[in-house]
Each structure stands twice: as structure tokens, then as C-alpha cells.
Amino acid sequence: MSLLIALLQALVLFAVAPLLSGSVRVARARLHNRRGPGVLQEYRDILKLLGRQSVGPDASGWVFRLTPYVMVGVMLTIATALPVVTVDSPLPVLGDLITLIYLFAIARFFFAISGLDTGSPFTALGSSREAMLGVLVEPILLLGLWVAAQVAGSTHISAITDTLYHWPAARSIPLILALCACAFATFIEMGKLPFDLAEAEQELQEGPLSEYSGSGFGILKWGISLKQLVVLQMFVGVFFPWGQMTSFSVGGLLLALVVAIVKLVVGVLIIALFENSMARLRFCATSRVTWAGFGFAFLAFVSLLVA
């Protein structure tokens, strides 16, 4: 049953991933007092791209062509292990925290290298920014989750989620600080303003994506939308596990589905609000701002030691 749930939730997350991007676009347009495109516009764009021929630069190699499939494949793999409707990971063999972090690193590595594989200065610059952002944000996410893992006594995502589900009051301060650090890292990982440095449309014309076209571009856009949804679901599923099933039942499954949708919708609205209240950061100022997130993670670690 757990394997079936893992496969089904991965397919559902894959299917609704463009809907997340479309919802963010609609929310952004409403906050700008514009009508904007519909929530299904992202599906139309991707389907149109999938029907076209994929053309790449002459200098590009196999990494450039393989990256869209790696992005989608890695994110689907992560999606099978996330707690979406259950407190425990439906695929325990992939549920270790270190495994999930390394899978995210693989996707980022291929995305950055694909920009260097084209010979274009725009994609190379976007790739360097993507790599730099990974260096800045991954320690925040890793340290924040590691504090939660220390409270749980295990690096497995099921143990962490179960511990937070019962919320140990004696460890509230380190857990709240770890939550803030991981929320900061999640926002950066989703590539929203003010941290969309690699794909900055005004400066770099989509950065590492600028040389993709046709079906390859459509698959990569779908993969990026899936990554945003997976990152958001990992955060809300681990740090806000209430409403998820502890044991399987039809009523519990229906309730968990409704709660999961509500949590994602609230997350999308909060992200859209923050995204539209800030301008893009200067490239040189990014490292100074990300120190705030690392400060939350470090304070969580110190408070855990003191406690």
C-alpha cells in the first residue's frame, strides 16, 4: 500500500505542478491589480512547447540534452518519499534526509552544468549564479533540518515528521528557529523574487534556460515547476504535519487530501505576497541577506545545545 501511495502522490504532484506556477502568476497579477493569465496558462505553454522541435546550440553536448529529463526524474524520485497525506514517508528507502539533500544537489548540479555546456555567455553567467545560490542556501536547509533530526533522534524524514506531529514542548525554541531557517531556504529554493538571480528576465533573459527550445524547454519548465512544488511540499509536510494520516483509512485519506491542498494554497499565497512586496536583490547583496537564514539555523543549533 505504501508503494502505491508513493507512486500515486508522485504522479499527482507531477500533474498539478504547472498549476502551482499558474496560481502564483494569477496571485501576482491580482496583487498588481491586473487580470493576468488564467491558472491553466502554464499547461497551455508547456503543451505548445512539447509539440515543437527541440533545437540546441552547435556547441552543446549530452549534458544540455539530458538535463530536462534529469530534473523531472530526480524531482519525481523525491516526490515518492515526501510525507504528503501520511506522517510517515510512503517510500522509506528514500526517506533519509541526507539522501533527499543529495538528490536536490544532483538536480542543481545538472541545471548549472547545462548552462555551461552551451557556449553562451548568458547561460554561463546564469549557471554561475545558480551554483553560487546553491552554495548559500543548501547549508541553511541542511542545518535547519539537521536540528529537527537531532530532536527526533534520527535523520529519517518519517521520524522527524512524527516528532513534529507530537511537538515536544521542551524543544519548541530550537524547532521554531529551525522552521524559520527552512522557510527562508524554501523560499530561495523556489527561485522567487528577490532571489531569482539565475533566471533574471530583465538582465539574463532566463539565464540557463535561454538556449532551450521546443520539447526540451517544455520538459525543463515542467521540471522546474515540479521542483518548486516538491520543495514547498517537503517544508509543509515536515514542519506542519497535522492533518496527515498516522494510519490508513478512507476518511483519513480524504481529510489528508483536503488539508494538503489547503496547506499548499496558503503557502502559495504567502509566497506570492512576499514575492510582490520586494524587488530583486543585487547579485552582490545576496550573500549578505542569506546570512539571516543561516543565523536562524545557527541559533536553532545553539539553542538545541543549550537545551
Regions found by a protein language model. Name each.
Residues 270-297:
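Interfacial loop-to-transmembrane junctions
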Residues 57, 76-92, 111-120, 154-155, ...:
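Transmembrane alpha-helix boundary signature
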Residues 299-307:
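Juxtamembrane boundary at the C-terminal end of a transmembrane helix
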Residues 6-17, 92-105, 167-189, 255-256:
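Alpha-helical transmembrane segments
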Residues 93, 147-175:
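Juxtamembrane/interfacial segments at transmembrane-helix boundaries in multi-pass membrane proteins
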Residues 113-116, 241-244, 264-280:
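Transmembrane alpha-helical segments of integral membrane proteins
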Residues 29, 33-50, 194-217:
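Juxtamembrane inter-helical linkers in multi-pass membrane proteins
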Residues 80, 99-114, 135-151:
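Mid-bilayer segments of alpha-helical transmembrane spans in multi-pass integral membrane proteins
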